[in-house]
């Protein structure tokens, strides 16, 4: 396993470790929360398929596991001898912030037992000090919201990923007469283009055929639209990726979802494919109007 692909997320309870783990998961990492420290070496020695689709590993470890503090130094040494050099990320926050977060969630603090909440927070902070000292990265999340923390962790995850992380893009053609897709992020209406449905020799065909594509795409209106819209997508997609958006569904509609929307969606698909993406495409209503032909 690549040495840069192993992370241990640790730190104070309430500092955002679960949020950090979600960011690693979104970046294609295999993640385990509350991993028993004694099982880590055995887990990392398990064989992986050569074609496994994993960018790396991220394990959340903290005082919830009874043996964590006592065994962590020896396990870390053992990992190093076997070629596994984890990057330790220590998350923390101001005591007042942790107190506020726990008060809002009403969860029990793992260092609680018979102590008050503030005493538990102080106790954990003291217990975790040796781990903090050996951590490569210390992130204070006091002034972070969820999105800001995910963005910082995502930058770390992407930098060490074994392969580039890209957003999943799906194209969906549809007919407005059958309803707008509820899961669409972007919806564009092609009903301003001339409708092949009213051309006798094109009526029975669909937007995947050369005849319909030529009819739809060769108009000045379609060419102007595609120039502007494809430029907009080229601008938006990197920004969506930067914000951590994992999926983008682009819905292209016309009246029945058989001709214009299909031809335009196919053109957008080709453009995104040429840009290095691997978009999916579904023509939801392409066969819905066949009984009316």
From Swiss-Prot:
Chain residues that bind GTP: 62-65
Keywords associated with the record: ATP-binding, GTP-binding, Nucleotide-binding
Molecular function GO labels: ATP binding; GTP binding
Superkingdom to which the source organism belongs: Bacteria
Pfam families named among the record's database cross-references: PapZ_C, RapZ-like_N
Binding site for ATP: 11-18
NCBIfam families named in the record: PRK05416.1
The family this protein is said to belong to: Belongs to the RapZ-like family.
Its job: Displays ATPase and GTPase activities.
Protein name: Nucleotide-binding protein HRM2_27900
């Amino acid at each position: 396993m690549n040495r840069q692909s192993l992370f241990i997320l640790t730190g104070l309870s309430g500092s955002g470790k679960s949020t950090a783990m979600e960011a690693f998961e979104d970046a294609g990492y295999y993640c385990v929360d509350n991993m028993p420290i004694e099982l880590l070496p055995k887990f990392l020695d398990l064989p992986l398929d050569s074609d496994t689709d994993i960018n790396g590993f991220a394990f959340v470890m903290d005082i919830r596991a009874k043996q964590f503090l006592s065994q962590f130094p020896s396990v870390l040494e053992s990992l190093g001898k076997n070629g596994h050099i984890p990057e330790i990320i220590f998350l923390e926050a101001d005591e007042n912030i942790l107190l506020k977060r726990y008060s809002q969630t009403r969860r029990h603090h793992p260092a609680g037992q018979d102590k008050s909440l503030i005493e538990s927070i102080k106790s954990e902070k003291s217990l975790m000090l040796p781990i903090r000292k050996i951590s490569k990265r210390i992130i204070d999340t006091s002034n972070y919201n969820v999105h800001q923390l995910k963005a910082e962790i995502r930058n770390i995850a992407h930098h060490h990923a074994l392969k580039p992380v890209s957003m999943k893009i799906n194209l969906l053609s549809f007919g407005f007469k059958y309803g707008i897709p509820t899961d669409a992020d972007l919806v564009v209406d092609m009903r301003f283009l001339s409708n092949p449905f009213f051309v006798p020799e094109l009526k029975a065909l669909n937007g995947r055929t050369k005849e319909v594509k030529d009819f739809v795409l060769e108009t000045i209106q379609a060419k102007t639209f595609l120039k502007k819209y494809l430029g907009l997508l080229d601008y938006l997609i990197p920004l969506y990726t930067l914000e951590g958006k994992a999926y983008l569904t682009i819905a292209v509609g016309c009246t029945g979802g058989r001709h214009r929307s299909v031809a335009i969606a196919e053109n957008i698909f080709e453009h995104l494919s040429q840009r290095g993406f691997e978009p999916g495409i579904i023509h939801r209503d392409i066969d819905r109007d066949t009984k009316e032909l």
